[in-house]
Amino acid sequence: MPSKDIVMPTLRNPFDVESDERPESAVAPAPGPYDEAVREGELLRVRPQTAAGPVQIGRQHAKRRMTVWERIDVLRDPGTEPTVLYQNWGPNLDGASIVTAICQIGGREVAVYGHDFTVRAGSMDATNGTKLANVIRLAGRQGMPLVGMNDSAGAFVPAGIGGLDGYAEAFTALRKISGVVPSIMCMFGYNAGGGSYLPRQGSFMIQPSN
């Protein structure tokens, strides 16, 4: 027989709680700053998809036009999720008129942008112009085709000259990738201002006859 002084190996975990009652140390702590930051980050992540609201979405559907998120769902390969590119963190910025993403289309990565007409009629300001220019430049650097879904009222007038600056930056970026990667521009609805000029700089343009 083994001596009582010899410690025998065992698979039992000495820290296991054998009773159904959890010790006080196992009680989940109250939410702290980290939990609040995670919650706020999740709200910011979903803000672009919820910025419009049911009324504006209904108006878009009444015009027999899809929202930008529905167009992305049609474009992407089944079973894949778009990688939405965020930049405009802050009040009324992300989700304000422009969505940029990387999607799997036909088995390859494609850079995609689309105006969200349900928010500010898809109009552009300087911040969103930079966001658009960034995804265009990304397409050129990574050798990805670019698909643009244009549904915009042009520059955001309350932003003043900033709206024109935004389109100027996007125009410059699109011209620089011309001949480097193909760009397919789709026209939806009644585009005005830069919303009608920018697509003409693409490799191909698709628009309805009316």
Stretches with model-predicted labels:
Residues 2-184, 190, 195-197, 201-210:
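Terminal-region recognition feature
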